[in-house]
Amino acid sequence: MADNVNHPAHYEAGPFECVELTRLYPFMGGNAIKYVYRHRLKGREVEDLRKALWYLDHAEPDELRPSYTRRDARALGAATPLTVPSMEANLALPDNGATHLLRVLERADWQGMAPFWKGMWELARGRDSGLTRAKRAVARRISLLESDYSDDELRLLDGWSAPPAAMWRLRARGMEL
């Protein structure tokens, strides 16, 4: 019997459990990640992606970066958490593991969302431009899912292999791959 409280299947399907990454983030960032991470696994792809996009649209860049705790600050020799401007985050804060996990998801192209994971990695490294990349990736996926493409055609557009007939149908519609 599946344990939908402690270990929901839709969070265990990836290279690691989603909570391993989301617990490293403040509320807004953790929710955006959660909805993208699971969007194909719960059967409500567009709804989950719209929720992720809502969080991305309403958060400040610093709300989409990993949280650094007192323990992280002590590693730098500080007695209390440090307030560090975005531009300095790349150099000033210790890595709490989020950047590694984001790279794992990007390299695995988890859920076909490598550009989103890369954007979140850029944000975690202090680059505000990552927010634009993350938003574009989610918006693009929503428009693809709302289109009249077949599942095989979507797999091709995501970079996955699909039956040759799907490629022919896309080419007939004017899509070049």
Residue positions per predicted region:
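Intrinsically disordered, low-complexity regulatory regions
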Residues: M1-L177
